[in-house]
Amino acid sequence: MAATAGRLFRASLIRHVSAIPWGISASAALRPAASRRMCLTNALWSGSDQAKFAFSTSSSYHAPAVTQHAPYFKGTAVVSGEFKEISLDDFKGKYLVLFFYPLDFTFVCPTEIIAFSDKASEFHDVNCEVVAVSVDSHFSHLAWINTPRKNGGLGHMNIALLSDLTKQISRDYGVLLEGPGLALRGLFIIDPNGVIKHLSVNDLPVGRSVEETLRLVKAFQFVEAHGEVCPANWTPESPTIKPHPTASREYFEKVNQ
């Protein structure tokens, strides 16, 4: 009886170990959840060949593209410290910055989320909302918000943190790393009609520029309002170009004196 139980245990253990993603040790996979998350995080940020091998997004879903309608999403978010169901429909008539980050309680992620939150009023001034998304639960989001910033937490938030626990939103937006089961740093600017105007995806170790995101929102809005196009490094104080062979000369003569 004992021998049979031992064989069953060893067979179960072998199956468990064989299912562990590359770049993560068997001993790490058997640790408690918090320890496993730290091990997973270290492996993904290590830049090793095994970690890079795990960086494969799903090929069974059509990735969204600029000029196409944004994939629909719905889920539970933490908004002003409360749980709230939100969806893409809630942002009709507004610009939306939807950005994905890998995990709560990590390192680069809080710097990005806090930076967007601190600039929330400037986004609101141009009729734009900001929503952050990760594969963590809304309970994890709330716990992170309730953690002081000096301890790596988020503190008070002026933007929504959306839970994608099923990973379906990340998958639909083409940013899910199927192996480790987390999202790359994808950022989408969606216009009031639900059309994607901009998308970018960073590898895990590098954060994004909030100032550049705000500049892009303003640029797309300027084009819509004035019918002129925005040159490289455009700011609201910069000259723009009339998209016509003759009329465009005004701009080129002005900047090339």
From Swiss-Prot:
Record keywords, A-Z: Acetylation, Antioxidant, Cytoplasm, Disulfide bond, Endosome, Lipoprotein, Mitochondrion, Oxidoreductase, Palmitate, Peroxidase, Phosphoprotein, Redox-active center, Transit peptide
PROSITE patterns from the UniProt entry: THIOREDOXIN_2 (PS51352)
Location of N6-acetyllysine modifications: 92
Residues bearing PTM N6-succinyllysine: 84, 92
Catalytic center residues: 109
Modified residues (Phosphothreonine): 147
Domain of life where this protein originates: Eukaryota
Signal sequence region: none
PTM notes: Phosphorylated by LRRK2; phosphorylation reduces perodixase activity. The enzyme can be inactivated by further oxidation of the cysteine sulfenic acid (C(P)-SOH) to sulphinic acid (C(P)-SO2H) and sulphonic acid (C(P)-SO3H) instead of its condensation to a disulfide bond.
UniProt KW Ubl conjugation keyword: no
Annotated organelle transit peptide span: 1-62
Pfam families documented for this protein: 1-cysPrx_C (PF10417), AhpC-TSA (PF00578)
Gene Ontology BP annotations: cell redox homeostasis; cellular response to reactive oxygen species; hydrogen peroxide catabolic process; maternal placenta development; mitochondrion organization; myeloid cell differentiation; negative regulation of apoptotic process; positive regulation of cell population proliferation
Cellular component, GO annotation: cytosol; early endosome; mitochondrial matrix; mitochondrion; nucleoplasm; plasma membrane; protein-containing complex
GO molecular function: cysteine-type endopeptidase inhibitor activity involved in apoptotic process; identical protein binding; protein kinase binding; thioredoxin peroxidase activity
Tissue expression profile of the protein: Predominantly expressed in adrenal cortex. Also detected in liver, renal cortex and medulla, and adrenal medulla (at protein level).
Subunit (UniProt): Homodimer; disulfide-linked, upon oxidation. 6 homodimers assemble to form a ring-like dodecamer. Interacts with NEK6. Interacts with LRRK2. Interacts with MAP3K13. Interacts with RPS6KC1 (via PX domain).
Main function: Thiol-specific peroxidase that catalyzes the reduction of hydrogen peroxide and organic hydroperoxides to water and alcohols, respectively. Plays a role in cell protection against oxidative stress by detoxifying peroxides. Acts synergistically with MAP3K13 to regulate the activation of NF-kappa-B in the cytosol. Required for the maintenance of physical strength.
Similarity comment: Belongs to the peroxiredoxin family. AhpC/Prx1 subfamily.
Name assigned to this protein: Thioredoxin-dependent peroxide reductase, mitochondrial
Species the sequence originates in: Bos taurus
Gene for this chain: PRDX3
